Amino acid sequence: MNRLTSWINDTHAAPSGAAFAFVAPQHNQPVFDIEESTEDVIDAAVQSAQQAFLQNKRSTLAQRTAWLNLLAQVLEANAARLAEIICQDVGKPIRAANFEAGRGAQFARACAAAVQQLAGEVVPVDAAAAGAGHFGFTRHVPIGVVAAITPFNAPINLLVQKLAPALAT
């Protein structure tokens, strides 16, 4: 039986030894084993995410828009396969799984469009006499790594609903 491990920084995490069987809801039979993530594996994932954040925190709105549009393109290009996986994973009917795969791409595109609206504000700071004639401004900037736990019942949609806004902002 195949064994799935965590995928961190373009590589599989080292096996911990502990795993559990994934049982397909369609036939109630084990399909593959899933490696349990140890504290070390989780720490490695957080460190990898932090490293990626440091490399990308100065990304432009255009870059973030491009990333989100690429996410939508990848979801659309793989929609049929993703729908099959959703069916196997949670036992959804294919029609619902197809809808979910498409909805993830739509949400990513919506977030890409929203990035273009992330303008700062110019704020007068003349509440104090020394601020007369002066202005401050606000700007949206990334602040760090996001951890998200996604429920099982809509794996693509709920993941994208957490991932895309984090990439957008």
Name these PLM-found stretches.
Residues L4-T5, V23-Q29, S48-Q51, A129-A130, ...:
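Short, functionally important structural connectors and interaction interfaces within domains
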Residues I8, I34, I42, V46, ...:
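Hydrophobic aliphatic residue packing
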Residues M1-P30, P124:
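Hydrophobic face of amphipathic alpha-helices that form TPR/SEL1-like repeat modules
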Residues G17, P25-V90, I94:
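N-terminal alpha-helical segment of soluble enzymes
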Residues L163-T169:
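Conserved short alpha-helical elements in the N-terminal third of ANL/AMP-binding
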Residues A66-L163:
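N-terminal Rossmann NAD(P)-binding subdomain characteristic of aldehyde/semialdehyde dehydrogenases
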